[in-house]
Amino acid sequence: ALMQSGGFRKALLLDGETRSRIYSPKDRKTAFLFGDGGIAAIIEKGDQFEESYFSLNSDGSKESYIKMDAGGYRNPSSVETLKEKVVDEHGNIRTEEHGYMAGADVFNFVLLEIPKDIKSLLAFSNFSTSEIDYFVFHQANSYMNTYLAKKLKLESDKVPTCIEKFGNTSSVSIPLTIVSELQNNLEGNKKILLSGFGVGMSWASTIINMQ
């Protein structure tokens, strides 16, 4: 939006995630899924690039799918919120200030909403899947991304993945996948579709050009 207003043409975007500090190491349902990471990306506006397309979505009714119960303004940190508690019959332990996910709900949400969002964006932009060089999905779950690729009838070599190397690095996962898996495949002007989701629930897709 800032670039579109004409204020500047080039920006350095820095993003870092330390998920290991948010999830309890004693919560085996969640902690082992995540990794820490950071990226730096240069974003540029110019006449040499084709038009980009975006789809941004949010549904607050599903806020319980990924959340942290305390530690913010609504439920401030206290002695009570920092107490470790056994949270299920499997002996998983966390405090109210640790994050957690309703895994099955998140999984079902993604399989329902993300394919629809991608198809809608492709229709709006008048592109077919064959005209997109790569599809880069948020690296949350390898099975989930395999399903998305099959649902959209994508060739496997157009859907890079790095979750086996780094785990789920949250907002870093898409640019990290580009750097890790595509850095030697971006010569010329490549058209890439990015799609991710997260807390909210919120989800978004974009078609951009990379050089």
Language model features: what each stretch is:
Residues 1-7, 111, 115, 133-211:
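Claisen-condensing/thiolase-fold acyl-transfer catalytic domains that form or cleave C-C bonds
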Residues 6-38:
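Flexible, glycine-rich active-site loops centered on histidine and acidic residues
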Residues 27-108, 112, 116, 197, ...:
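Condensing-enzyme catalytic core mediating Claisen C-C bond formation in acyl metabolism
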Residues 117-125, 177:
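Stable alpha-helical structural segments in soluble proteins, enriched in small hydrophobic residues
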Residues 126-131:
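Short, surface-exposed connector motifs at secondary-structure boundaries
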